[in-house]
């Protein structure tokens, strides 16, 4: 399926409620045309963070979920831990493991493959 900003926003709202207790602020949602990165949490240039997804991949529900949760973990660490963490260090790794074992969500990307159109 083609990724849209509407899909990303709807899933963000759903996952924020389900997994993050609505602790994440609303961000802007965008799409980008490059294959790398698959998705990204963009730093604010206008005071607002944004999440963007690549349009070159054939997305499905599981890929969207796993990838968006990955970005939401980054956002959670920035907002709630007051750390500007965009790497995949120990805090990120521990949250990723929690999602893997508790919810069976591959936010760490260990088992994820991204098919192109």
Predicted segment positions?
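Metalloprotease/metallohydrolase-associated module, dominated by Zn2+-dependent proteases
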Residues: 1-63, 79-117
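Active-site recognition of the HExxH zinc-binding catalytic motif
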Residues: 66-78
């Amino acid at each position: 399926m083609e990724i849209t900003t509407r899909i990303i926003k709807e899933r963000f709202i759903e996952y924020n409620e389900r997994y993050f207790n609505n602790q994440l602020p609303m961000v802007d949602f965008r799409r980008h045309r490059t294959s790398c990165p698959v998705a990204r949490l963009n730093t604010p240039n206008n005071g607002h963070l944004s999440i963007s997804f690549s349009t070159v991949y054939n997305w499905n529900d599981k890929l969207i979920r796993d990838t968006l949760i990955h970005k939401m973990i980054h956002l959670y660490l920035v907002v709630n831990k007051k750390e500007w963490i965009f790497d995949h260090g120990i805090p990120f790794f521990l949250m990723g493991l929690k999602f893997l074992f508790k919810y069976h969500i591959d936010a760490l990307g260990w088992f994820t493959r991204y098919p192109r159109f």
